[in-house]
Structure formats: structure tokens, C-alpha cells
Amino acid sequence: MKEILAEMITRAAFKAHEQGVLPSDAIPQPGLEEPKQEAHGDFSTNIAMVMAKVQKMAPRKIAEAIVDNLEDPENFLVKTEIAGPGFINFYLRPSLWQRVVKGILDKGDEYGRSQIGAGQKVQVEFVSANPTGPLHVGHGRGAAVGDALAALLDMCGFEVEREYYINDSGRQIRTLGLSTWLRYCELKGKEIDFPKDCYQGDYIKDLAKRIQDENLADLDSMEEEDAVLWCARFAANDILDGIKQDLKDFRVVHDVWFSEQSLYDDNSVQNALEHFEKTGDIYEKDGAKWFKTEDRGDEKDRVVVRNNGLTTYFASDIAYHKNKFDRGFDRVIDVWGADHHGYVARMKAAVDAVGRDKDAFEVVLVKLVNLLRDGEPLAMTTRGGTFETLADVVNEVGADAARFIFLSRHYESPLDFDLELAKKQTNENPVWYVQYVHARICSIEAKAKDFPVSLDFDWDRDEEILKEIEEIRLMKALARYPEVVEGAARTLEPHRIVFYLRELASAFHSFYHDHMVLKEDQTPVLTKARLDLVTTVRQVIRNGLALLGVSAPESM
């Protein structure tokens, strides 16, 4: 409906210009919003105020010129009103909203799909946790955000690839190997003063015990450095297998698993450094090599090769992001923890140095999750009945609740996640509240099979059948869905889908509270119309939940 109204407004403005009423032919695209108060109509535009400066006229005079020249051959409008300083309010014929029902019935799972991203290739890299320990709840929120972003972009016509960057090179991997080796030595009866900078978790002891119990390697006959390196590879691979399983249980599937070590194995890091030395972007100072990021918007230049000859993570990240764009992606979206916010400027500088538009590289920063139980903060320890890992949370509350709640607030805001609330089967639980509507409608549809309905009902008839205010509100909410999806994709804000689904569920409850779908004393035509209406609600809830990676149960 917005598109039709926008065309009507634009034509009216140009007609007013041709008549000499509006001096300028600079007519902007009309913006249309739903007024907060229903008394102000179905849609409202402020185009008259936007045009006032160019037209050198009072906004109300511009609004009058537009309204006087509106052409409505199909009688879409009941009336128009000019309000306040120059708002134009439009009141639509109620039967028009019934077109939404037919559109959803026709499109089904494809309702909400658009082609705004057609021809654009996008990579979403997310989670990318170091393979030095199990995924924690913060990684879980990042996984939910990244996966939902990828689904939204795909729904809007982008060609999307999901990628996980495996940080399997550098100091943290050697530290992992040393930690495992030392725990192995403890099992062999050696007294070890375990370093504080090694990994302390009990999972390291479990890895060492596996090596011993399963006799996976003859570490005792190896030189210590060789044993540490073997332990590093074994531990990293084992932990990575666990990460993959945790993500699978969380319904997250990556298309590509990209190894940092591969950038060293194929000389990508060395080639990138040599390239930027030739271009003058890298210089030497104090025995180290520095990348000129300050000239490109960073607060200072950054070291890429230390004075001991070892490369920094920034060096491999430069090579990695160059590789991304070399693979033909038009946009690269990285989902990071909020604690990496200081890293954004240097990476944008690197992308700029590679010769790509800084804006083609976007970073989504995800803030921490505070776990609660019945409103009380939960101690974050590895063992003993408290929770740290994503697997622990998913095992207790399920993937549906975890994903929905992780996405229930903007990722730039900290999130309180109450484990007990996530298990409740009441309206307090946000995912249960939405899923219950889907299940309730499935139950209504099942009962309808034994109920007299009009089988020859035709939604193409221009006949006002659904005219109760709750029915119209529900159809308006359904009509907003494609716009919500596009908005969430454009802004990279998947929480908008959660907000929308809760609003739609609320609109359904208001409708169902006052109006029975299957009712003995109503006409078969009205029964069929209402049955189709709730079917479209079920369809849109199913579509929205699918974008979030949440199931739509038929019974609860």
C-alpha cells in the first residue's frame, strides 16, 4: 500500500507543479509512516514540510496543493486530511487490507523475500572463537546474531556466505599445547608449577588424560618442544571438533572454515607484508615493522612485525581480509565481541590500504551476556552446577529459547539471560509467547476440517468482510512484515524481527480474545475469511522464526 500511496503523492505533486502551484519540479520520494494514533489515519506523510524550503512556500499550502491534485481512480482512499504544520493523513478503505491476506496465502514461505541485494555477494564471518576452549555464552550470542544476519541478507536477495576464521596459529596455540603437555606430565607423576598464563580449565586436564588413556602419542620419547607442538595440534583439533558440534546443536552451519595457519603456509602473510613495504604503507622503527594506519583514520600506527621477527595478529588479519575481497565479496561483515571495538579502525585502515572502500567492511560488535537464575546473577565457573559454556545453556533451555533470547535486544546492549524464565511455559517467556500463537493456530486449522466453511471463497472479490478493528489491526501488522525484514537487513539489526513477532503475537491475542474463528452462528464466508486470516498469521510467524533459526511447533 505504501508504494501505491507514494506514487499517488508524487503524481499529485508533479501535477501541481505543471499547474504552476508548486514553483519547483524538485519532488522528493515521499516518506510514509503509520501514525501512532489510529485517529490520524492509516498512513501519514511529511513531504510538504520536506519540500517547503525548495518550494519557498508554507508547508500547509504545499499539502493543500498535493491533496487537491490527488487522483484516486480505484477509490483506495476514504478521505485525506491535512494536520498540524502540514502533515497529510490518509484513511484507506478497510477492504484494501484484505489484499494482504491473499498475498501471504499466495507467497507462503516466500512472503517477505525481496531483491534489494540482488547481484551483491556478501560474506558474514562470525563466532571465530580461538580453538583453545569451549564456546561460552558470549560466543552463543554472536553465533545467533551472525546466523540471523546471514539469513536476513539471503532473504533480501544477497548472495551470502557464512565463514568461521580458525585462529590456529600464534602464541595462543603454543600456550594451549604447553598447557596440555604440562597436565600430561602431571599425570605421569611429575611435580609441575603450572604457569598462570597457561589455560587453567578442567578441559585441559581432560585432554591430557585422553592422550594418556588412549595412548595417542609417545610423548615421553619426544623432545619437549616437539611434544608441545603435538599437544597443540591435538588439543586445537579436538576443541575445534567440539566447537563444530556445539554450533551444530545450536543450528549454526558455516559454509567455510578458514584456517589462519593456511595464510602462513601459502605465504599470503609474507606476500601482503612485502606488498605494503613496496607501497610505503609499512616502515621500520625500533627494530619493528609498522603499518601506517594513523594516516587512514586509526589513532596511531600499528606493529605488524615485532622486533623479534615474529608477526602480530594484525599482520595475518591484513592478509585474511585482503583474501576475502580477492574472493570477490562486495561486502564483508565481521561479527566481533564488543571488547574488540578498538580493533575496528585499524582493520578499516587495512581495507582502505588494500584498495577497497572502507564502508565495504562492516563490523558488528556484540556485547556480553549476563546469565541469571530467577533474577540472580549466576557465577561463571567451568564446573559444579553453574554455567559458562554455550552447550550448558542449550542443554538446559534448548536452542529455540537460547537463540530467540540472544536476539531479543540490540547486540550493542548488554543482555540479561534468565535461565529459569527461558524455561517457563507462560507469556513471560518471549519465545514461548510467539511459538504458542503458531501452535494455537495449527490447532484451529485442525479443528476447521470438521467445520462448515465456504470453500469457494474468493479473496479477489472487492468485498469488505474483515472489518472489525482487531481484524484490521492484524492485517496491518501482517502488511508490515516485508518492510521489517528489509529494514533489519539494511541496518544489520536482527532484533527487529523479534520485536515484530512479539507485536504480531500481541495483535493475534487481541483479535482472538474478542473474535472466534470457528463459530456456529457466523456465516461460512466469515469463518473462511477469519480462518485464512489466522493462517496468514501462522505463516508470517513461521517465516520470521525461520530467519532467527527458531522452530515453529505445531503443538505445545
UniProtKB/Swiss-Prot annotation:
Pfam families: Arg_tRNA_synt_N, DALR_1, tRNA-synt_1d. It catalyses: tRNA(Arg) + L-arginine + ATP = L-arginyl-tRNA(Arg) + AMP + diphosphate. The keyword Protein biosynthesis applies. One of its GO terms (biological process) is arginyl-tRNA aminoacylation. Gene3D superfamilies: Arginyl tRNA synthetase N-terminal domain, HUPs, Isoleucyl-tRNA Synthetase, Domain 1. A motif ('HIGH' region) lies at residues 129-139. InterPro entries: aa-tRNA-synth_I_CS, Arg-tRNA-ligase, Arg-tRNA-synth_N, Arg-tRNA-synth_N_sf, ArgRS_core, DALR_anticod-bd, Rossmann-like_a/b/a_fold, tRNAsynth_Ia_anticodon-bd. Its EC number is 6.1.1.19. GO terms for molecular function: arginine-tRNA ligase activity; ATP binding. The keyword Transmembrane helix does not apply. It comes from the Bacteria. Keywords: Aminoacyl-tRNA synthetase, ATP-binding, Cytoplasm, Ligase, Nucleotide-binding, Protein biosynthesis. It is an enzyme of class 6 (ligase). GO terms for cellular component: cytoplasm. It is found in: Cytoplasm. CDD domains: ArgRS_core. PANTHER family: ARGININE--TRNA LIGASE, CYTOPLASMIC, ARGINYL-TRNA SYNTHETASE. Belongs to the class-I aminoacyl-tRNA synthetase family. Monomer. NCBIfam families: argS. This is Arginine--tRNA ligase. It comes from Desulfatibacillum aliphaticivorans.
